[in-house]
Amino acid sequence: GAYLSRHERIDHVHITGSERTFDAIVWGSGDDAVRRKAADEPLLTKPITAELGGVSPVIVVPGPWTEADLAFQAEHVATMRLQNAGHNCVAGQVVVVSRDWPQREAFLGHLRRAMASAPSREVWYPGSSDRLSAVRAAHPDAAWSDGGRRAVIEIDAGDHDLEVVEQFAPVLGVVLLPGTGQAFVDAAVDYANEHLIGTLGANVLIDPVEQTRLADGFEHTLERLRYGTIAVNAWTAIGFLTPALPWGAYPGGTLSDAPSGIGVVHNALLLDRLDRAVVRGPFRPFPRSLLSLRPNSRGRCSLLPTPPWFVTARTGASVSAGLTRYRAGGGLRALIPTLWRAFRA
């Protein structure tokens, strides 16, 4: 890596990794790196862009959820944490829930069960087992499952390592904030902006009734979220999978302070001076999503009973393979068997 990044025929460096790796490339290592950083004398003298992950929030806006809504969205959040065993740069890590939501405990119960019942996965990424062991030692009474390889941990706002250290492992923090409605949304955005490290991706779950009630107030609050990709009723990884959208940290990273990186990739439309991308999805799966077709509803319709990327999807592997073949050049006729398998998820 050092040889390639400093080679005379390399004009620009881009990496995906950790802030530690970024610092090693830009400033070097050891005491010399400390001196260089203090003097603003980078070892790397060519432009660099980077995507470095971070701690991604999942903001759960309180509303009149049905029992089916609670179960589905709990699986949604579990997917954000457990997909690829938690080894994702934009895995959900801190769930922000209203302390005053009447359905708070029901939702958290569904979330613990969803985390515990998802298919077992090995924690394989280098260093993740060590971080998991450290969390287990610090929180032996948390809701552990999968043989001690997963946890749901209630933490105090503004005072926990889960807020400032990307775990890259199946550990999910839960923070309770006061308020409901617009007051809660404002408080949750302030908390995410001020206390969670990184600006790569933020997820927001809100039912159509509450979104319609909050109207433009909700949209204006989204504008204050300092994240490169915001997903409303979706996972920010969908933004990563959409080539037309930019993917990277919220603008403002520097060589000396880039917790989620500098610059963007993808952006197939080559748009300039972008702050963020916003991805929107359906709050409910098919057929319950058909309720979103009512007049004046801000909800979105879905034709999928279970999205194929959910960790609970029974046909996720075959559907993902079929969609990949379709995007690589397959025709609509070849897509039909894949859609049929998706309906059976």
Model-found features: residue ranges?
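Glycine-centered flexibility sites
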Residues: G1, G17, G53-G54, G86, ...
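Short hydrophobic/charged patches on amphipathic alpha-helices used for structural packing
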Residues: G1-A2, V189
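ALDH superfamily catalytic-core signature
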Residues: R6-H12, E19-H160, Q182, V232, ...
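Conserved C-terminal structural/oligomerization subdomain of aldehyde/semialdehyde dehydrogenase
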Residues: R9, E75-T79, V96, Q103-S117, ...
